[in-house]
C-alpha cells in the first residue's frame, strides 16, 4: 500500500508539472497560445519530441532572462509546445548516401565549394551528376505524406487561441501545404528554420550561412539565401543543419523572442 501511495504521488506530481511553470497555474489560462514544431526529414517522432522540449526550454529560459519580470504575464508562461510530426522518409537517406559516396577525399575543399567560396572549382563528379540528382533532390525534400499532412491540418484547425508554426527543413513543405488547404480564417502563421523553399513565410525565416544541406540544394530548389551566421560546431552536427545542434544553439534567444513577439507584440508608445 505504501508503494502504491508513493507511485500515486509521483504520478500526480508529474501530471501537475505539465500545467504549472514557475508557480503559474496554467489550467486557469483559457486557450493558451500554441507553438507547433514541424520536424525535418532526418528526425523521427522521438527526435522531434526532444527538439520540441528543447525549444520549450529555450523559450522559458528567455522569459526568465528578461530584466523586467513584471512584464511577464501568466499567459506568456503558459505557451504550449506541440509536435506536428511528419515521417522520416527513405528518399532523404538515399540522397545523403549519394553525397557521402561521392564526396572526394578532400572534404574541406568540397564544403568550401558548397559554401560558394570564390575561386573554388565545382567538383567534376558533382557537375556530371547534377542533372541526374535534381529529380532525387526535389522529391526528397518536397515529398509529403498525405496522412501526416491531414494530421497537421486537423491539429491546426482544432486548436483554439493564438497559434504559430516553427517548421524546420523539409517540414516547411508541410506547413506551406497545410495553409494552402486550410480555409483562410484558419491559416496559421509560420516561421521557417533552414527552409529549402524559395518564398519567405508570414513570420520570416532563419537560415545559416554554413548550413551545408541548404547550401547544397539551393541551386536546385531555389532556397532562400542565408540570413544569419551559424558558427557551426561540426563535431556535434556535421551537416550544420540540425534544429537543436545548430539553430537553437546559435539562435535560440532570437527564436524565443520571435515566439514571444508573435503572440505578444511589443506596445510602441
Residue map of PLM features:
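Bacterial N-terminal signal peptides that target proteins for export
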Residues: 1-7
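N-terminal signal peptide c-region/cleavage motif recognized by signal peptidases
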Residues: 15-17
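Lipid deacylating catalytic domains
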Residues: 21-269
Amino acid at each position: 500500500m505504501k508503494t502504491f501511495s508513493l507511485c500515486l504521488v509521483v504520478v500526480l506530481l508529474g501530471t501537475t508539472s505539465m500545467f504549472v511553470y514557475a508557480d503559474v497555474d496554467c489550467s486557469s489560462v483559457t486557450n493558451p497560445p500554441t507553438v507547433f514544431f514541424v520536424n525535418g526529414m532526418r528526425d523521427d517522432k522521438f527526435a522531434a519530441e526532444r527538439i520540441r522540449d528543447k525549444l520549450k526550454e529555450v523559450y522559458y529560459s528567455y522569459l526568465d532572462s528578461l530584466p523586467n519580470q513584471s512584464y511577464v504575464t501568466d499567459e506568456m508562461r503558459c505557451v504550449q509546445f506541440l509536435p506536428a510530426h511528419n515521417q522520416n522518409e527513405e528518399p532523404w537517406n538515399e540522397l545523403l548516401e549519394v553525397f557521402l559516396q561521392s564526396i572526394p577525399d578532400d572534404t574541406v575543399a568540397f564544403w568550401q565549394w558548397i559554401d560558394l567560396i570564390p575561386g573554388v572549382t565545382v567538383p567534376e563528379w558533382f557537375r556530371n551528376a547534377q542533372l541526374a540528382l535534381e529529380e532525387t533532390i526535389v522529391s526528397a525534400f518536397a515529398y509529403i505524406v498525405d496522412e501526416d499532412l491531414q494530421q497537421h491540418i486537423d491539429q491546426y484547425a482544432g486548436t483554439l487561441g493564438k497559434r504559430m508554426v516553427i517548421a524546420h527543413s523539409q517540414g516547411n513543405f508541410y506547413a506551406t501545404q497545410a495553409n494552402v488547404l486550410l480555409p483562410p480564417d484558419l491559416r496559421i502563421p509560420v516561421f521557417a528554420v533552414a527552409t529549402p523553399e524559395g518564398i519567405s513565410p508570414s513570420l520570416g525565416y532563419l537560415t545559416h550561412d554554413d548550413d551545408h544541406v541548404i547550401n547544397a540544394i539551393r541551386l536546385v530548389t531555389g532556397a532562400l539565401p542565408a540570413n544569419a551566421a551559424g558558427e557551426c560546431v561540426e563535431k556535434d552536427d556535421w551537416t550544420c543543419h540540425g534544429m537543436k545542434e545548430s539553430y537553437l544553439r546559435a539562435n535560440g534567444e532570437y527564436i524565443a523572442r520571435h515566439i514571444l513577439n508573435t503572440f505578444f507584440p511589443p506596445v510602441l508608445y
